Amino acid sequence: MKTFLSAVLAVCLFALPVSAQNGDDGDSGRSLPRMASLRSKLVNARSGPGSRYPIEWVYKQKNAPVEIIAEFDLWRQIRDWEGSETWVYKPMLSSQRWIKMTNKGTSSIYAKPEHDAKVIAKVEDQVIGKVEKCPEDKDF
């Protein structure tokens, strides 16, 4: 049930816009864009790909989901759940997929992706959940 719940959360609650780079390969040889998450509870967001660039802000939520949209050496340009774009150091990212509830208030989680499905949980804003398995017809 946890697997399905995580997949439903991913489908319903965290859909980032697809970049124009769709299908391109980055410096790493992996396709762009792709999903990742923040590895640490403190991650510096920089204005460019290098430590010489100023810190714009600091992410303070471990496992928060992000979309990698560009690569340069050991730096990754990411888009976060609010649509902000910045650069982070590659070791601060994880390939594990997590989702983040971004609806204000409490939202329902359903047993199946159908309009008449049973509500199995209530989730509050800013809750993070691990994606254990995606539905076969979806790729997140």
Would you name each region that the model predicts?
Residues 20-47, 58-62, 69-74, 79-84, ...:
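SH3-family beta-barrel domains
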Residues 2-10:
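Sec-dependent signal peptide recognition
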Residues 54-55:
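Beta-strand-rich domains and repeat architectures in extracellular enzymes and scaffolds
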Residues 51:
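A short, aromatic/hydrophobic, helix- or strand-capping loop or linear motif
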Residues 15-17:
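N-terminal signal peptide c-region/cleavage motif recognized by signal peptidases
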